[in-house]
């Protein structure tokens, strides 16, 4: 919700707010109402934040409702970008967002371990460090 609020003033960006239950910890809208709306959309990109990202397990989250909505966004998108800090790389959380082979791009910080970055690039994922 906070990102939608920031981008709403930019006329060249179309903002869709799904509805659903607000999750205060992450400002996400989750639940059946959000799922119903997302199921009707086609997206060019899904840009997702996650709690953990492992080369074998993929992207995961601590909260299953959050993971479910993010999974649905990933399945509705042509491209999936995961944005996460390096402390979450090589980690796993409770609920899967998407498998590694569903990820197109990872954006992380420069403190990421080279072996973990290599594990993602070997799987055909573009890795951007900034």
Write out the residue ranges for each language-model feature:
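Conserved phosphate- and dinucleotide-binding cores of soluble alpha/beta proteins
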Residues: 2-130
């Amino acid at each position: 919700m906070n990102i939608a609020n920031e981008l709403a003033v930019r006329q060249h960006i179309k903002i869709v707010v799904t509805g659903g239950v607000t999750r205060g910890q992450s400002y996400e809208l989750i639940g059946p109402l959000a799922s119903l709306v997302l199921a009707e959309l086609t997206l060019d990109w899904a840009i997702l934040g996650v709690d953990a990202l492992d080369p074998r397990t993929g992207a995961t989250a601590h909260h299953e409702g959050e993971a479910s909505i993010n999974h649905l966004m990933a399945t509705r998108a042509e491209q999936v970008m995961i944005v996460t800090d390096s402390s979450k790389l090589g980690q796993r959380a409770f609920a899967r967002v998407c498998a590694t082979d569903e990820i197109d791009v990872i954006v992380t910080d420069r403190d990421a371990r080279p072996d973990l970055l290599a594990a993602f690039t070997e799987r055909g994922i573009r890795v951007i460090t900034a």
